[in-house]
């Protein structure tokens, strides 16, 4: 059994792991190291802070000190880990080092910012810390450009619109949520955003940004320009892999782990947004919760593989919320779409008429759990 566990990170994945370890072992030494304050907040709330008038500090649910006391932890906030000596089992920062028996990387993912001229003018909303840095600018902004029409971009577009701001959403795809579902399924939400006043610029690409006396000038294709007060990058996340790479671990899109959450080094594990589990990056709450339960057991001497069921993904767009599950991005599915006033049920079936995916909206979201049971594992 491990004598000491060091966790790098303090987000949802790290906290779920701590809670699951402490359910089974109240005394094993646990050390958490992170670059942020280590205060707890609910990250999905960032998609709704503007319409709800919340400040960054309003999001805090539990301070780092309260967390440490509740779960008997050693915490090192505002600490940048610079290196991992995997052979010596040592984690290093500029001024400190920690010995470990088992190490867990829960370093999360960072928001991708498109590499265009003026990219430094783009804001990101991937953490409480990032929101704190730009909350005044976002609150005061009348005109907002959101770059990226995926899950987060669609949520933010609706939220800023509900807050009374003039919102433009740009994406190079022909429809919103293009990486998650086909246009015939996402069209209901797309129409709702348009009805609310969101200006959609699809099949368009941002060319550059420039600061002006009255705001930010965004140049699009064909030399078209629009002026806004704030630009938000919502073009996806990139797993944080730099530390793992320096430690000599196997990296692909994320830190590669097997069904036991173990990396290419037997005493180092990865969890959450930074992990690539058997080739899959799963930056959603449910797989992280299930992964944390399994990893806690394995760190305490068990040998339990992770088995993920079909899981719901929730798109938090309050005027037209969606739940989806299964292989919604598959190109070969045939979609059977039933639309009523109270909502939509879209079923994606394969050539054998086997249900492989579904999307439900509004009041018909209550049908999700029944459909979930019929999806293949």
From Swiss-Prot:
UniProt GO MF annotations: oxidoreductase activity, acting on iron-sulfur proteins as donors, NAD or NADP as acceptor
Catalytic activity: 2 reduced [nitric oxide reductase rubredoxin domain] + NAD(+) + H(+) = 2 oxidized [nitric oxide reductase rubredoxin domain] + NADH
GO CC terms: cytoplasm
Pathway assigned to this chain's UniProt record: Nitrogen metabolism; nitric oxide reduction
Known cofactor(s): FAD
Cellular compartment(s): Cytoplasm
KW Oxidoreductase (keyword) present: yes
UniProt EC number: 1.18.1.-
Alphabetized UniProt keyword annotations: Cytoplasm, FAD, Flavoprotein, NAD, Oxidoreductase
Matches recorded under InterPro entries: FAD-bd_OxRdtase, FAD/NAD-bd_sf, FAD/NAD-binding_dom, NO_rdtase_NorW, Rbx-bd
Entry keyword annotation includes Flavoprotein: yes
Pfam families registered for this protein in UniProt: Pyr_redox_2, Rbx_binding
UniProt family annotation: Belongs to the FAD-dependent oxidoreductase family.
Reported function: One of at least two accessory proteins for anaerobic nitric oxide (NO) reductase. Reduces the rubredoxin moiety of NO reductase.
Record's protein name: Nitric oxide reductase FlRd-NAD(+) reductase
Organism of provenance: Escherichia coli (strain SMS-3-5 / SECEC)
